[in-house]
Amino acid sequence: MSKKIINEVIDILEDKKYTYTMIEYPEHNRKSVDIVLNSKEPTLIRVSEDKVTKEEISDLKKIAVSTLTASLVVTNEEEEDIVSVKADNVFAVSPEGFKKVINGEKIFLYRTRGGIFIKIRNYILKHKREEMGYSIGDVAKFLGVSRKAIYDYEKGDSDVSLEVAEKLIDLFGDDIIGDVIWDSIKGKKEVIEEDITEFSPESFKSKLIYKLKENGLNILSLKLTAADLIVKDNENNRYLVTIENKDYNKSMKKFYEAKKLASYTKSELLIIIRTSKMLKECEDLGYKTYEENDIHSLIDEIKGSNGRQS
């Protein structure tokens, strides 16, 4: 984590009097979440001087999509007025771009591997076209694109090039231009299930995933933050599951940071304990704990029947 950029981010948040918490696990540079911002929806922030890894982006995507919010990667590699779309609900911005997001300013330009595009509000486009009496063919001809392209614009399946955006504004006005981050989040369908690493008898986490999925629960596996799993039941209740690791002090730090993450993402924290010493201490601290050989109690808790209360 870059000290210079993190200080910029904190200054921006404190200037706007936002409530936030720092996530300080794991304690090395490669982690997926640095800050959780408490706004209308929790926003995850990763601050990086370098390019973020696929694993970091994967964690950010899973948490953001499961909470229907945004993950922001703040880096000097991005231009001020352009957002890079890294994955579903994961957006990279410059420190200047981050300030605009926090100030509520609209950012409408974004970059993908296919080029630079402008975010449009598809529902406003369709409403204005129908209100003004234009057919899809009329608009396609005016823009110089296919009828299918107009269908895609109106369904929200495609955004537009700068050239097409200028013509749309001439025809319908600039209120059809959207915000890359928040308009994308609002229209995003929640994705819960995914392919998990194949069952491995040597890995406790792998066995746990297998048992949870076997009981009809939706699982997302995390690698570079304090929680190990996001679990959702059929009623869409969300749990963060954290597993004790080999080092006592690191485990205590992990649990503390996972508690912060759970609080800000409005999730319930469940801790899996692997030693008797840790079990007693965690129960004294008020954590909801389960022993590794008693996974059925954890499953009962999540499914709402006979869960053991700590």
Curated annotation (Swiss-Prot):
PROSITE patterns to which the protein is assigned, alphabetical: HTH_CROC1
Annotated keywords: DNA-binding, Transcription, Transcription regulation
GO molecular function: DNA binding; DNA-binding transcription factor activity
Boundaries of every HTH cro/C1-type domain copy: 125-180
Family matches, as InterPro entries: Arc_TR_HTH, Cro/C1-type_HTH, Lambda_DNA-bd_dom_sf
SUPFAM superfamilies: lambda repressor-like DNA-binding domains (SSF47413)
DNA-binding region location: 136-155
Domain of life per record: Archaea
Name of the protein in its database record: Putative HTH-type transcriptional regulatory protein M1425_1284
Lineage of the organism: Archaea, Thermoproteota, Thermoprotei, Sulfolobales, Sulfolobaceae
